[in-house]
C-alpha cells in the first residue's frame, strides 16, 4: 500500500470509527465463530500473554484487551495505521505497541518479555501481518517455534480445506496462505493445523479463514478437545 493510500484509508477510518467500541462487530473480522475459537483456547490455556502481528486499526487488539486480563504486545509495520490504532485504543490497559517489521518485533520480544523465566503459561500468537509481497509468516513461525515449547498460533486469512466460503490471501506464486504452501513448514516445526469446525455459510462477518497451530503432544491434544476446531487430515 502506498503512503498516500494509507493516509486516505486512515482518514476515512478515523471519521467512521474514531474510538474503539466493544461490540459483536469489533475484532476477528466480526466473526462470531472465530471469537468462539479464541474463547475455547482461552478457557483451555488461560493465556497471560498475547502477541499480535498486524495491528491495523486495532479492532482485534481492542477485543483481546477488553475480553481478557492478558498483556497484549502488538506490532504494525505501517506508521499511519499504528498511530490510528493508538488513538482509537487510548485509555485501554495492558497494550504494548511497536512499529516495525514483525520478525524483528518477535526477536526483540524473545530477548525481553518472552524469556522462559517470565512465562508461567503458554503464549497465544495472532499472526495477521501479511499484506505485502514479502510474506513474513514462515519466518514468524520459525522464530516462535525456535524459542518456545508451549504456544498456540492463529493465522488469519488462511485457506480452510474443503470450505471455499472462507476467504484467504493469495498474492500469487508461493505467496498463498494455504496448506500447499505451508504444510512443510508446519511439519518441520512439528505443528498440527486445526481449522474452524463451522461451515462457512454459518459464520458471520468477513468469513475469513484461519488456522490454529500447536506443537504435537500435550498442546495439540488440548486443541483436539475444542469443538470449535477440527484437525486437518493427518
Give each language-model segment a name.
Residues 1-124, 129-234:
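A short alpha-helical cap/connector motif
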Amino acid at each position: 500500500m502506498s503512503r498516500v493510500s494509507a493516509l486516505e484509508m486512515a482518514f476515512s477510518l478515523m471519521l467512521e470509527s474514531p474510538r474503539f467500541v466493544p461490540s459483536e462487530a469489533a475484532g476477528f473480522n466480526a466473526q462470531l465463530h472465530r471469537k468462539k475459537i479464541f474463547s475455547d483456547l482461552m478457557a483451555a490455556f488461560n493465556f497471560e500473554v498475547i502477541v499480535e502481528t498486524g495491528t491495523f486499526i486495532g479492532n482485534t487488539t481492542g477485543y483481546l484487551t477488553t475480553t481478557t486480563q492478558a498483556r497484549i504486545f502488538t506490532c504494525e509495520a505501517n506508521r499511519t495505521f499504528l498511530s490510528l490504532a493508538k488513538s482509537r485504543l487510548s485509555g485501554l490497559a495492558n497494550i504494548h505497541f511497536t512499529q516495525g517489521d514483525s520478525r524483528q518485533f518477535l526477536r526483540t520480544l524473545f530477548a525481553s518479555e518472552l524469556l522462559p523465566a517470565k512465562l508461567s503459561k503458554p503464549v497465544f500468537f495472532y499472526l495477521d501481518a501479511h499484506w505485502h509481497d514479502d510474506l513474513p509468516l514462515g519466518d514468524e513461525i520459525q522464530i516462535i517455534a525456535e524459542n518456545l515449547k508451549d504456544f498456540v498460533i492463529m493465522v488469519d486469512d488462511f485457506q480452510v480445506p474443503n470450505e471455499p466460503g472462507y476467504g484467504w490471501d493469495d498474492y500469487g506464486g508461493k505467496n498463498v496462505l494455504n496448506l500447499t504452501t505451508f504444510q512443510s513448514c508446519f511439519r518441520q516445526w512439528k505443528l498440527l493445523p486445526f481449522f474452524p469446525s463451522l461451515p462457512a455459510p454459518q459464520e458471520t462477518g468477513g468469513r475469513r479463514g484461519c488456522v490454529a497451530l500447536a506443537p504435537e503432544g500435550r498442546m495439540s491434544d488440548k486443541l483436539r478437545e475444542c469443538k470449535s476446531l477440527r484437525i486437518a487430515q493427518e
